Amino acid sequence: MEMSDYDIVNLASIVEREGLNADQRAHVASVFYNRLAGKLDGLRYLNSDATMMYVTGGEVTADDLQSDSPYNTYKHEGLPPTPICSPSLEALEATLEPSDSDDLYFYITQDEEYFSQTYEEHQQSWN
């Protein structure tokens, strides 16, 4: 996928906030590239909690997901208008060299990580 330097920094800022370590960030970057390529039902939504947390400053509620904010990547396809943080070198490297996966979903906590290709698998991973 062809991206400008600015877009790479923008995506890396989201990868920075979603992953907790280098391996997770490379896998998260892969998921986001798959989503940007339209592999999620032909849509290009990032569906990132991190972009919404940038807007809310904390937890994200169901009401927040209805926001028309350009940072609401559940409602607006593609990248948000600006980076949400200054990404680390690790996040930039992960974005430039993502893992090779077909995954479209992930769930990461301090203790667990789940990556999946279908929404059904995703739901099972955190239920």
Model-derived regions: residue spans:
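Bacterial extracytoplasmic/cell-wall-associated proteins, especially those involved in peptidoglycan
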Residues: M1-N127
